[in-house]
Amino acid sequence: MLFATLEHILNHISFSTISIVITIHLITLLVHELGGLRDSSEKGMIVTFFSITGFLVSRWASSGHFPLSNLYESLIFLSWALYILHTIPKIQNSKNDLSTITTPSTILTQGFATSGLLTEMHQSTILVPALQSQWLMMHVSMMLLSYATLLCGSLLSAAILIIRFRNNFFFFSKKKKNVLLKTFFFSDFYVKRSSLKSTSVPSFPNYYKYQLTERLDSWSYRVISLGFTLLTIGILCGAVWANDAWGSYWNWDPKETWAFITWTIFAIYLHSRTNLNWKGTNSALVASIGFLIIWICYFGINLLGIGLHSYGSFILTSK
């Protein structure tokens, strides 16, 4: 009972804090004079991280196994993984474009996890025999870390497409303030442009947009490369575990099939980066398609509750 109460408190603290962080981001986006509030949002993300970490540790202690046995626990872990990605630019002292992706993604995953749809999964249960293995933590954690990483990289690629073709979208048309550009700190370039007007340094209209898209493209490539590596490790660990549990390394289960499709899509993306004719818009399009594939692989199969990987699915639990 004590652990359940602690989990409930920590879960709601993390969700409330990340909601405040999102609000601060929106305020600083609309009111430039309040840019100093960004420090508060970073502190909020730290509070969120420790709250989610405390939740996972508490869940682990109460259940006796790492909390990755159902959709609810995996969503909480996914939120935790998104924060880890959020801190990478901080460590490298780089411009934190990732925060524009990781912060909203964290609140969405956290929000769905705490919604009424997954209430029956909130109580920790004993693992079914097939999941009582040392491979549970290794395989599932690697897969979820890869999902979080690939989702962020895919969204960065989608942002590149929107910036390059924003005139084709009503929301991002020139008649309106381009929220996306401001979100990625594109205002920095306006300051530089105004300072260059009084100098002899040449400039051209699309130079600043080019700098932004190149920076996002670089981040997208690095993040997806990391995610692809984690996905490969996760699939290999799963194959070894499958051989121990079911006597076969690969069964073309729906989850396995979509994991293979996901791996193939991002392998195509990485290969397209080596071809100058595909690098840029074409590779970003491939990565954006990968975003949908990941959600089908991770979320769609769990909702349907089919195949050998249906443990902890929404349908099975709701029955």
From Swiss-Prot:
GO terms, molecular function: heme binding
GO CC terms in record: chloroplast thylakoid membrane; plasma membrane
Superkingdom in the source lineage: Eukaryota
GO biological process: cytochrome complex assembly
Compartment annotation: Plastid, Chloroplast thylakoid membrane
Keywords, alphabetical: Chloroplast, Cytochrome c-type biogenesis, Membrane, Plastid, Thylakoid, Transmembrane, Transmembrane helix
Keyword Cell membrane: no
Membrane-spanning parts: 17-37, 44-64, 68-88, 143-163, 223-243, 257-271, 286-306
Membrane topology of this protein: Multi-pass membrane protein
Pfam hit, one: Cytochrom_C_asm
Known partners and oligomeric status: May interact with Ccs1.
Described function: Required during biogenesis of c-type cytochromes (cytochrome c6 and cytochrome f) at the step of heme attachment.
Family membership noted in the UniProt record: Belongs to the CcmF/CycK/Ccl1/NrfE/CcsA family.
Name of the protein this chain belongs to: Cytochrome c biogenesis protein CcsA
UniProt source species: Lolium perenne (Perennial ryegrass)
Lineage start: Eukaryota, Viridiplantae, Streptophyta, Embryophyta, Tracheophyta
Gene name tied to this protein: ccsA
